[in-house]
């Protein structure tokens, strides 16, 4: 199922020098977001930088949101992860998509112009309405805290 999402190109290199975000395969859940900068950026160990993607999206449908997730290779091989761990794009947001990159590694890492930085994934949203109760019905899990259910 394909859902139309409005996309605004903020940098003229998108669609010419660099491709529009797209799914790489039929089974892909995310589309790659690229570093659309004027110069290569070197991120020092412990440093966080905000990197433009050259696009904005307007999801519009309140039953959907977009999330920005890390690319596994950058984190595993180079220690480059998202500074906010996950970026949440609400359906009514219309501003530029930026990627917060944090170098948690021990070596400087350079992001070149056009490098793939993160993935954009669209997810369903359910807006909850709280129902106040005095007690919960019992469950197998109960109110046990962190680590309560063990590892095995």
Curated annotation (Swiss-Prot):
KW Protein transport (keyword) present: no
Catalytic activity of the protein: dUTP + H2O = dUMP + diphosphate + H(+)
Major enzyme class: hydrolase
Key word Plastid present: no
Pathway entry: Pyrimidine metabolism; dUMP biosynthesis; dUMP from dCTP (dUTP route): step 2/2
Cofactor: Mg(2+)
Any single GO BP term: dUTP catabolic process
Name recorded for this polypeptide: Deoxyuridine 5'-triphosphate nucleotidohydrolase
Source species of the chain: Shewanella piezotolerans (strain WP3 / JCM 13877)
Lineage: Bacteria, Pseudomonadati, Pseudomonadota, Gammaproteobacteria, Alteromonadales
Encoding gene per record: dut
């Amino acid at each position: 199922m394909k859902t139309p999402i409005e996309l605004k190109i903020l940098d003229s290199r998108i669609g010419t020098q660099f491709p529009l975000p797209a799914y790489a395969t039929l089974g892909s859940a995310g589309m790659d977001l690229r570093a659309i900068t004027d110069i290569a950026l070197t991120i020092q160990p412990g440093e966080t930088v905000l990197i433009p993607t050259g696009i904005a999206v307007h999801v519009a449908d309140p039953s959907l949101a977009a999330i920005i997730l890390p690319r596994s290779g950058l984190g595993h091989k180079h220690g480059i992860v998202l500074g906010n761990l996950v970026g949440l794009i609400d359906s009514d947001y219309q501003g530029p998509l930026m990627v917060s990159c944090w170098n948690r590694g021990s070596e400087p890492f350079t992001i070149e112009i056009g490098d793939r930085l993160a993935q954009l994934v669209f997810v369903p949203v359910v807006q909850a309405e709280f129902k106040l109760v005095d007690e919960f019905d019992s469950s197998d899990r109960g109110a046990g805290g962190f680590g309560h259910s063990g590892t095995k």
